[in-house]
Amino acid sequence: MKFVKNDQTAVFALGGLGEIGKNTYAVQFQDEIVLIDAGIKFPEDELLGIDYVIPDYTYLVKNEDKIKGLFITHGHEDHIGGIPYLLRQVNIPVYGGKLAIGLLRNKLEEHGLLRQTKLNIIGEDDIVKFRKTAVSFFRTTHSIPDSYGIVVKTPPGNIVHTGDFKFDFTPVGEPANLTKMAEIGKEGVLCLLSDSTNSENPEFTMSERRVGESIHDIFRKVDGRIIFATFASNIHRLQQVIEAAVQNGRKVAVFGRSMESAIEIGQTLGYINCPKNTFIEHNEINRMPANKVTILCTGSQGEPMAALSRIANGTHRQISINPGDTVVFSSSPIPGNTISVSRTINQLYRAGAEVIHGPLNDIHTSGHGGQEEQKLMLRLIKPKFFMPIHGEYRMQKMHVKLATDCGIPEENCFIMDNGEVLALKGDEASVAGKIPSGSVYIDGSGIGDIGNIVLRDRRILSEEGLVIVVVSIDMDDFKISAGPDLISRGFVYMRESGDLINDAQELISNHLQKVMERKTTQWSEIKNEITDTLAPFLYEKTKRRPMILPIIMEV
C-alpha cells in the first residue's frame, strides 16, 4: 500500500459501507493485515437470478502473505457468508466465538474446505498477538450469542470495531461488557468503526426479553396449531419459542435445513436447552391435536423455496394450512424483501390462517442499537477519529451527527466508500488512496462469471421477451433457401400476431436479399443486419424491445 506511510495504520472496507451486507473490514500496519468479517449481501430485485453478492477480494489475494488472520464478530450471514469464497482464494487462519465457529464449520464442510482451514475459538479474555499488532475482544449484545467487538492494537494507536451491537439491559443471554468498553476507552482509541444500521431510530431498541414475553402471551392465547417463522441464526429467539412451547404442553417440529442446523449447533453448544422429548418428527404433526403442535420454520423473509413460502402457496409436501392455524412472523423484512414477505402473508390469510406480524405485536426486535445506544458506545470508547460502518449512506450520515453531538469534531469523522483507505497516526487522519473493490455475483456454483452484460440480457428477457430468427442460406449461390422463420418467447402470442410476424418475415427476407447481393460471407455481419433491421420495426409496432437472436444455417 504505497500511499500509506510506514508509521501509519490503514483502515479500509471491501464491503459494508453505503450498504447493508457483505461486511468485510481490514486494519493494516506495514506488512500485517487483520481482517474483520467476510460476509455476503442478499441481491436486490434487479440482480435477476443472482443468489448472493460478495466483495472483490483482489487486494486480499495479492497480499495473502500479510494477512495474519480473519476475526469474526458474530455468526450472521452478512458477516460469515463470504468466508468459503474467500478461503478458496487465500489460506488464512480464522478466529471467532464458539457459536460463530460452529456455524462456520458446517458451512466450510458443505464447501469442502473444512480440512484445510485452521479454526480458532476465542473468548472475551483472549489476546491474539502478532509481531507488530495484537487483537483482543469485548462482549457485546446482538440477536445472536457469542457476539464480540474487536480491538486491533497497532503502534500508532488502537482501532476498535464494534461489530453489530445493541445495549440490552435485560438480555436473554450474557449482557454486554460495559466495564471493559470503558477500560478500552480509558486506554485510548485512535479510531472507532461502529455499527450504523439503526442510527435513524431515536430510541433504545426494545429488549429481547420483551419479545419473549410476547411469545409466551401468544402461546397462552392460541388454541390451534402455531407456525412460527424467524431467522434460523436468532438462537435466543429459538430458545424462547421452545420454552413457550414446552410450558404450554406443545411439541416442536422443525422445518428448514438452516433451522435444523442452527438448533443442532445451539444444543451442542448449550445455547438451546429443552426436555429430550420436545422435538417430534415431521410425520407426527398431523397425528397430534392442533393445540399440542408448534412448527418452527424458515421463510420469515418470504424466500421462495423456504418452508413457510411453500406452506403459504400450498406446495409443501407435509404441511397445509388448516382452520385455526396461527402463523407468527418474528422478524422484520430485510430491505428488498418487503414485497415477497407481503405476498407470503397474503397467501397465508387466503389459505385461512391467522397471521401475527408487524411492530404492534412486540414479536420482533432489532439486534442493532438505536441512537441512544450508539451515543453510549461513542461515550464509552471515546475515539479520536470516527468511521461509521455497516449501513447505507444516510445511516452513516446520521451516525456522524450523533458523534459530533458526543464531542467528536466533524473533521475527525470519515464517511468512507468501499475501497477507500483511511490512514491514521497520532492527531492526523486522511483518506490516502483507494484499493480495488466492487461486487462479485454468485449464481449457483458460478462465482464472478455473471457480469453487467449478462444481467442486462436477463433484464431484457424478463421485461421484453425473446424473438428468434431462423434462416437457411445457400452460400454457394448467395440465396435464401428457407425462412426466415420467427419464434417468439415472452414477446407476443404467435397465433394472435400473424400480421406482425408475416410483416417482420417479409422485411427480413427483402433486406437479406440485398445483403446476399453484396456476397457477404461473414456470419456476424449477417446477424447484425437482421438485428438492426428487425429491432426498430418491432419497436415501431409494439413499443417493446425484445432480445433478438438470429440463427443462420448454411446449406
Curated annotation (Swiss-Prot):
Binding site for Zn(2+) 2: 78-79, 164, 390
CDD domains noted in UniProt: RNaseJ_MBL-fold
Activity regulation, per record: 30S ribosomal subunit binding to Shine-Dalgarno sequences blocks exonuclease activity.
Function: An RNase that has endonuclease and 5'-3' exonuclease activity, playing a role in both rRNA and mRNA stability and degradation. Endonuclease activity can cleave within 4 nucleotides of the 5'-end of a triphosphorylated RNA. Endonuclease digestion by the RNase J1/J2 complex occurs at a different site and in some cases more efficiently than J1 or J2 alone. The exonuclease activity of the J1/J2 complex is highly processive on substrates longer than 5 nucleotides, on shorter substrates is distributive. Preferentially cleaves ssRNA, possibly in AU-rich regions.
NCBIfam families named in the record: MG423, RNase_J1_RnjA
Additional detail: Present in about 2500 monomers per cell in mid-log phase.
Protein name: Ribonuclease J1
